[in-house]
Amino acid sequence: ERREGRPISPDRGPEILAKTKKNAQGKDMLDNGNEIIKTANHFVIINGDKPEKALMAMKSTQLKVSRGWNSLMQDQFETDPKTSKALPAPMFSRVYKLQSVENSGSFTWHGYKVSLAKKVDNASLYQMAKEFHNSLKQSNATATTEESNY
């Protein structure tokens, strides 16, 4: 197989990871020598002059940041005005600030720092985020029912 540094196939999840073994550097390798890179994807809206939808792929040292971000999102609650009970807030109902930070160990690299900025306070931005969320949910449901090309 060619080693061009690009994905060979879109295999995902525990099925492909179950076929790997850790090499001396701790990387997940298949028997054929291909590396499987664990990647966490976050669909986001970049809140600039004109909001833009984007995909943030986090791998390697940023997987810990991704897990922390997921925990931060899961720790957000809203109070139901009728019952006064705390309910999980939709992930798209918050604005998060992402900063670039320098990390160091045996070498130096830059990564992300994620913090909660505020609740979404712009109705059109909230609606855009909600529609984006719903379209992704629908796409995921469709993708799981289709048969693979591989």
Label the model's feature ranges.
Residues 123-150:
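Glycine- and charge-rich intrinsically disordered segments
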Residues 10-11, 23, 59, 63-67, ...:
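Low-complexity, intrinsically disordered regions enriched in charged/polar residues
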Residues 38-117:
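Extended serine/threonine-enriched, polar tracts that run as long, contiguous segments within proteins
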Residues 1-52, 105, 111, 119-121, ...:
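OB-fold ssDNA-binding interfaces and closely related basic DNA-contact patches used
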